[in-house]
Amino acid sequence: LSLDGSKELNSILQASPDIYYFSFAPTTTVKRSNSHFHDPISETPILLRIRSKLIGSRIAYLDDGKKTDSLWFENDGIVNTISMYGPTTGYNGPDPILEFEEAELLIPGQWYWMKIPEMDHYSIIGHLGNHERIKRAEEYLIQHAIRLKGLPAE
């Protein structure tokens, strides 16, 4: 989905006040010590390394002339990590978005994101990734399923 397509979609859709929203935000890059660019870590699958390096150093432009900044460089090899937190564009402005904290009270209608370090796009979906990372991704997903099961049913 393009940046402009995301903005258009976010203008149509709104968070429901009765639904809990969660987002995983994997990253397989590290910020360079001498610049604001990001490079893939050594465990990033070979098929994602070049794309990860490109995303980690390119600015994107919207149709209205606005552009992304270095916050958009961190990525999972396919998607920039900042896009995974939740909807921030659209005519209605950003949805409420918070980093998930295990001990905090969860509020419906709000987005909660969870950073997953050293995790690439392939591994989090269980396809073509590193076996160790896929196993770790499974553990995240099982833990999240348990979390979801514990949410109040209305």
PLM features per residue range, with description:
Residues 1-154:
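Lipid deacylating catalytic domains
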